[in-house]
């Protein structure tokens, strides 16, 4: 079962950057009721901050059940096909992440480990499908839109899951350096400026801590 206590407090959504607490809970409930291996990617992004391209490129060999960690060392994207003789204008490529910092190992929450154990298959199979066939990011984004619609949540970009993870993590008192490394960022400054969206409630809670000095 996915722990709702990890949802955190209500957040102020700026340009639909993150899910609200209510939306967060609705999405988790929907995934619990309808879970299949395709939806594991949503959990990896929402609870571990994994990018959509990284999610789509994952294979079961990237999951270490002994150390309960996930290895991120590749990403999938659709790019322009420069071959003039090619039938299609674009093609799917799987390559190393955009920066050295993006290559990382992330501890997997125990409830996700337990879900993974139920679907574990051959190491060369893709995580999202359990087969040799992958799901590309554009298709997975469309699948995510369907999940939102079926759970009654207003449309939001998949990348918002990563922003939601970062913001909830700060609210749960993650130290910023650990969070930055989990996200695969080049600097702590970038994490704070681009990925953390504190609510008025959270800011007030922090300000009230100053009362101890009165």
Describe every region a protein language model picked out.
Residues 1-8, 13:
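Single conserved hydrophobic/aromatic residue that forms the stacking wall/gate
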Residues 10, 14-37, 47-50, 58, ...:
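Long, amphipathic, Lys/Arg-enriched alpha-helical "connector/arm" segment
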Residues 18, 76, 113, 183-208:
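Catalytic-site neighborhood detector that most strongly recognizes the C-terminal catalytic loop/helix
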Residues 25, 29-38, 48, 106, ...:
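Short, basic (Lys/Arg/His-rich) helix/loop patches that form interaction surfaces
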Residues 30, 82-87, 193, 197-214:
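DNA/chromatin major-groove-contacting recognition/catalytic segments
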Residues 39-56, 69-70, 167-168:
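Short pre-functional
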Residues 57-118:
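Conserved tyrosine-mediated DNA breakage-rejoining catalytic core shared by Y-recombinases
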